Swiss-Prot record:
Pfam families: HGTP_anticodon, tRNA-synt_2b. It catalyses: tRNA(Pro) + L-proline + ATP = L-prolyl-tRNA(Pro) + AMP + diphosphate. Homodimer. Catalyzes the attachment of proline to tRNA(Pro) in a two-step reaction: proline is first activated by ATP to form Pro-AMP and then transferred to the acceptor end of tRNA(Pro). The lineage of its organism: Bacteria, Pseudomonadati, Pseudomonadota, Alphaproteobacteria, Rhodobacterales. This is Proline--tRNA ligase.
């Protein structure tokens, strides 16, 4: 993409309404525009990152054997009355009446609707286990929306639902989701720690939240520092192997890690003092096992091998897709702007032409743009007639992991400058070497 043809409405000054770094940089970098309290339009740069995150989530869900579908944002209220949650949910739920005076709602979550889909089409234990998921916009009418996409009213979420014959199978689904989530977040350059948490309005006996440590997080968390040394890495997982998934879950849940709702000071005090930590965290996902909480009242039953009918065991599992943008920025920025991890960057590298209109630099930039694109990479070429300082400031603000700087002096020596945004380190090399280096880096992502 050529920046001269791209829609990137960057702001020079910090917006007064932005209280935290991620909100400030998302507005300044032209990623979002607020349309109402807690409701945003996603502008091209922000939308690209959103789609990168969504793609990683899809890939890891499918890797784990989960099946995508798509449910509507509007739901009939009768489903929620059937489960008993319609009156319990409170004023966060946006309730709507259509022209036929039927009660509807803008879904804050989808347990009732997915249970209705299941009971309409599945009746035998032979069709189990089954896990369905979708990525869809949700709405919760927060009383005080703030912090940009971190606590908006409308948000994009991946929510998945498992249906199993018995408790043991449902716990395997729970473990499978935890393993899948660990891999998902690490691919995004995040360390998201699974912490024992409260189940809230969704309910259930077993739940973990995934939290990214950040001073701007809304959750108070307590943990053993040993958990921050764990890395999922590139291990290959057989998601059908119950023992393997259980072992990974034990590895990640053995160190103490809890939110304030479930914190146990007595247990925490048994950890060596030098490893005890308290901090703030940003919730980016949560997994639940809630047994027959929805299947029993809604009649989601299957016929077993002996002919009896039993309610299925269920769980739900969410990832805050749009919130993840804010969490990544909170965890990865400096005083110049965003620093995108390579896995979610909107463009793989920026090309800065220091002397637009100079034939040698123009030709070199065009060749770089063409060669990077031919290797399957997406460069952002700053071909604007602007000062070098302004171009560098834009690149630093939008946070592309790599920048290739092309100037007359370097081109005369057959060199360009490749700069790492995170470290600030620069290296001169040929254009071909720069293309090869970037292709190699992204081949491993």
């Amino acid at each position: 993409m050529r920046l001269s043809r791209y829609f990137l409405p960057v702001l020079k000054e910090n917006p007064s309404e932005a209280q935290i770094v991620s909100h400030r940089y998302m507005l300044r970098a032209g990623m979002i525009k607020q349309q109402a309290a807690g409701i945003y339009s996603w502008l091209p740069l922000g939308f690209k990152v959103l789609k990168r995150i969504e793609q990683i989530v899809h890939e890891e869900q499918i890797r784990a054997g989960h099946i995508p579908l798509l449910m509507p944002t509007l739901q009939p209220a009768d489903l929620w009355r059937e489960s008993g949650r319609y009156d319990d949910y409170g004023e966060e739920m946006l309730r709507i009446t259509d022209r036929h005076k039927r009660d509807m709602l803008y879904g804050p979550t989808n347990e009732e609707m997915i249970t209705d889909i299941f009971r309409s089409h599945v009746s035998s234990y032979k069709d189990l286990p089954l896990t369905l998921y979708h990525i869809q916009w949700k709405f919760r009418d927060e009383i005080r929306p703030r912090f940009g996409v971190m606590r908006g009213r409308e948000f994009l979420m991946k929510d998945g639902y498992n249906f199993d014959l018995d408790y043991e199978s449902a716990i395997h689904a729970y473990n499978r989701h935890m393993v899948s989530y660990l891999r998902t977040y690490e691919r995004m350059g995040l360390q998201a720690i699974p912490m024992r948490a409260a189940s809230g309005p969704i309910g259930g006996d077993n739940t973990h939240e995934f939290l990214v440590l950040a001073s701007t997080g809304e959750s108070e968390v307590f943990y053993d520092a040993a958990i921050t040394d764990l890395k999922f890495g590139d291990r290959v997982v057989n998601y059908d192997d119950r023992a393997e998934c259980e072992a990974i879950v034990k590895e990640w849940t053995a160190p103490y890690a809890r939110t304030d709702e479930t914190h146990d000071e007595a247990v925490f005090g048994q950890i060596p003092e030098e490893r005890r930590r308290s901090s703030r965290g940003i919730e980016v996902g949560q997994i639940f096992y809630f047994g027959t909480k929805y299947s029993e009242p809604m009649g989601a039953n299957v016929v077993t091998a002996d002919g009896s009918r039993v309610p299925v065991h269920m769980g739900s599992h969410g990832i805050g897709v749009s919130r993840l943008l804010g969490a990544i920025i909170e965890a990865s920025h400096d005083d110049k702007g965003i620093i995108w991890p390579e896995g979610v960057t909107p463009f793989h590298a920026g090309i800065v032409n220091l002397k637009q209109g100079d034939s040698s630099t123009d030709l070199a930039c065009e060749a770089l743009y063409r060669d990077l694109s031919a290797r399957g990479l997406e460069p952002l070429y700053d071909d604007r007639d602007e000062r070098a300082g302004a171009k560098f400031a834009t690149m630093d603000l939008i946070g592309l992991p790599w920048r290739i700087t092309v100037g007359p002096r370097g081109i005369s020596a057959g060199k360009v400058e490749l700069t790492n945004r995170r470290t600030g380190e620069s290296e001169e090399m040929s254009s071909g070497a720069a293309v090869d280096r970037l292709a190699q880096i992204y081949a491993g992502i």
